[in-house]
Amino acid sequence: MSHGTYYECEPRGGQQPLEFSGGRAGPGELGDMCEHEASIDLSAYIESGEEQLLSDLFAMKPTPEARSLKGPGAPSFPHYLPADPRPFAYPSHTFGPDRKALGPGIYSNPGSYDPRAVAVKEEPRGPEGNRGTSRGSYNPLQYQVAHCGQTAVHLPPTLAAPGQPLRVLKAPVAAAAPPCSPLLKAPSPAGPSHKGKKAVNKDSLEYRLRRERNNIAVRKSRDKAKRRIMETQQKVLEYMAENERLRNRVDQLTQELDTLRNLFRQIPEAASLIKGVGGCS
């Protein structure tokens, strides 16, 4: 492939030829660098009329109508649309999902475009703006609290102001939403014995009478238990005495039996009678 088809443009007026610090590379070095490249001649697309067109574009000045739409420090742009002669009233809320606040006829007529009517959301600056944004943003914890607990969080439809706190309202337990987790179950109501219980003032007569009745009942139960214990101990003592008396009786009868046997052994007739009675029996 030939590498000699390079073109040099004629230097324009007021331009200095570029000079490189290094020496110009030889044909051999250029051939090594651009081995697989092709050069395109662009001189056919460049004419003298193009330079005049560019100079006319840069020399164009903005119209007085365009200047009226800009401030004193704004850059000059000649392609502004004419301003809307109708008076524009700024709405109180021009950002967020509520776009109807801008008015129904803003976008109906394409020729009545006013750059001031476009609502631009500004990012908060400083720590106060960050706190306001964080309050107005969606928080999954608030959703969980509103659906799983007895607390209802009411958020305003618009973004909350930096100094405006959120309102937290306590809802009754009966009207609260059912718990979404088995760990967050509502406490079961008390039994029927606790339903009729009411708070009584300790200085009232009813409270004193109730305490006195309770004390009397406690004393009666304690006395009854003591009586049962004493009765049991008395019965134990009685049984022990009866047992001792029976043992003494048994010993006495045993001694009498031994005495009678000795007497009958000393008398021979009595001994024969005893033997005869023993044989007949």
UniProtKB/Swiss-Prot annotation:
Basic motif: region residues: 208-245
GO BP term (any one): DNA-templated transcription
Subcellular localization: Nucleus
Keyword flag Acyltransferase: no
Mod. after translation: Phosphorylated.
Pfam families reported in the protein's UniProt record: bZIP_2
Cross-link entry Glycyl lysine isopeptide (Lys-Gly) (interchain with G-Cter in SUMO2), positions: K121
Entries under InterPro entries matching the protein: bZIP, bZIP_sf, C/EBP, C/EBP_chordates
SUPFAM superfamilies, A to Z: Leucine zipper domain (SSF57959)
Entry keyword annotation includes Ligase: no
SMART domains documented for this protein: BRLZ
Family the UniProt entry places it in: Belongs to the bZIP family. C/EBP subfamily.
Function: Transcriptional activator. C/EBP are DNA-binding proteins that recognize two different motifs: the CCAAT homology common to many promoters and the enhanced core homology common to many enhancers. Required for the promyelocyte-myelocyte transition in myeloid differentiation.
PANTHER family tied to this protein: CCAAT/ENHANCER BINDING PROTEIN, CCAAT_ENHANCER-BINDING PROTEIN EPSILON
Name of the protein: CCAAT/enhancer-binding protein epsilon
Species annotation: Mus musculus
Biological classification of the source: Eukaryota, Metazoa, Chordata, Craniata, Vertebrata
